[in-house]
Amino acid sequence: MEPEAEIIRTQLFALRDEAYRIFHSALMPTVPPETVIGVRVPALRRLAKQLAGTAQAEVFLQALPHGYYEENNLHAFLIELIRDYDRALAETEAFLPYINNWATCDCFCPKVFAKHKKELLVPIRRWLDSGEVYTVRYGMEMLMRYYLDDAFRPEYLEWVADVRSTEYYINMMRAWYFATALAKQPDAALPWLTEKRLDLWTHNKAIQKAVESRRIPLGMKQLLRGLRSRS
């Protein structure tokens, strides 16, 4: 390990919270507990801001694969702070294959992506087609985050629905996406449920998440409850 990366690891261990480590490890069954240090997200974000743009950060970004969960999250938060779109995209694509859990996958989105929604659609399609669990999930997350408001197009619902997988963390994101679409684009999203165009698990899970959401009107929730299916 490069000395710069070793120094960062030492900094992370200095921020360790053992009770938090035990609690958070239980939420991530795909992450070996011994690779979790136990650093809270606000502390990781503060460290990322301190390191951003430094030579030490540049060395750390090249030090893949990392040995600890928090090193991966710190890596993600450093990518978030990159202001150049092409560089942020390149670092994201280099990092995605090393993500091994939902929490790291969902924790970061480079701010510069919001200014390049048209260009971002190209890598999103590539991510959705990758077959890699967390790369696919990340592509869906970007569609959910950036393309359910003014940039929405109905075919994006098809992009997500067309992903076929037995992987829990992909299918959970599909359900989350459609539940969010019901809140933000109900006219386009609701037919996917009334016409039962999704697989049974995603159909019912999307309904569950929508019914639990505060963004869904009561009338819509009542309708959705009637759409639950057993076959």
Regions found by a protein language model. Name each.
Residues M1-S231:
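Alpha-helical scaffold domains
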